[in-house]
Amino acid sequence: VSELLGTMPPEWIWGDVLPVLRGADAVLANLESPITSHRGAWRTSWKMFHFRADPAAVAMLRCANIRVVSLANNHILDFNAEGLRDTIRHLDAAGIAHAGAGDDSAAAAAPAALRLSSLQVGVLAATDTMSSFRSGAAVPGTNYIAVEHESPALEWIARSAAALRRDGAATIVLSLHWGPNMRLRPRARFRAFAHAAIERGVDIVHGHSAHVFQAVEVHRGGVILYDTGNFIDDHWNFWNFGSYWNFPFRHDDWSFVFLVDLEAGRPRRLRMIPVQTRPWPLRRATGAACEAIARRMEKLSAAFGRPITRAEEGLAIAIAAADERR
C-alpha cells in the first residue's frame, strides 16, 4: 500500500466503493498495522510478519470517511510501543478516533466516542489474539481478553456500555479481533460471547481476524458481524500466492461493505454490498462474482435463523423493534 502513495492519489485504492463509504455517516475499520516510520521491530516473541504503514497512509483513511478504528489486533505493536504511539499520534492529528490499544491497560480498554450529526456512538475494542501484546498497569499494548462463557471481559463490556449510555451514547459498537485465520464459521463459544455482549448493552458486534467473511446474525435487536473479512490488504502478495496462505477456495478476496441503518440509535436494517478486494483498486462485485459472494453469505447465515433478502445493492436484513424483546 505504501508504494502507491507516491504514484496514486489516496482515493484510488478504494475504487468505485469510495462513494458508498462517503455516503455513510461514518466508517469503522480494523487498522491492522501501525502507522509509523520507526524501524525497531517486535522481537519479544516470535512473529512471521511485521506490518508497517507510511504516515502518509493516513490520507487513505481520511478520504474514505473512516472516522474511528480499532487498534486491538495482533499487528498494532509490530514496531513496539514506539510504533503504537506514532499510530495514535497520527490518528489524533487526523481527527480519527481509536480504541483497543494504548499506553496502559486503562487506555487500551477506554472507549472511543464518535459524535455524528444526529447521535453519539461509543466504540469498544478488544482482541483475543497475540497475548504477548497485552497491555498492563504501566505497559503499552492491546485490550486483550478471553472469549469464554464466563469471561471477565463480559463485566467490562457491561460496565463500559452502561457508562457510555450515561454519557449520551445512543449506539454502542464492540469491535473484536478474534479467532483463527481462514475459518468460515464462528466457534460456538464465539457465538455465545457475542450474544452475551448484546445482552449486556452492545448494539453491534464488529468481528474481524479470519481474513474471510463469516455469517451475520440478529440477536435481541443487535447486529452481529462474526467476521467482516479482508478489505484493503496487501499481505496476499507476500509470496505472490495470489491468495492469503494460498487458500484460493476460501476466497479471502471476497468481502462486503456492511452498512447498519439506525433509528434512534437502534439497528433497523443491515445492508451488505458485495466487494472484490483484488486486484486493486477495490471494486463492487458484479456478475457471477457478485452472485457467488451473496450465495456464500446466505449459506453461512442460514443456520442463524434470520432470512436474508436480496436488495438492489446486494443483501439486506430488516430488524424490527420487536426483535429487541426476543
Sequence positions of predicted segments:
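Acidic, metal/ion-coordinating pockets
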Residues: 1-326
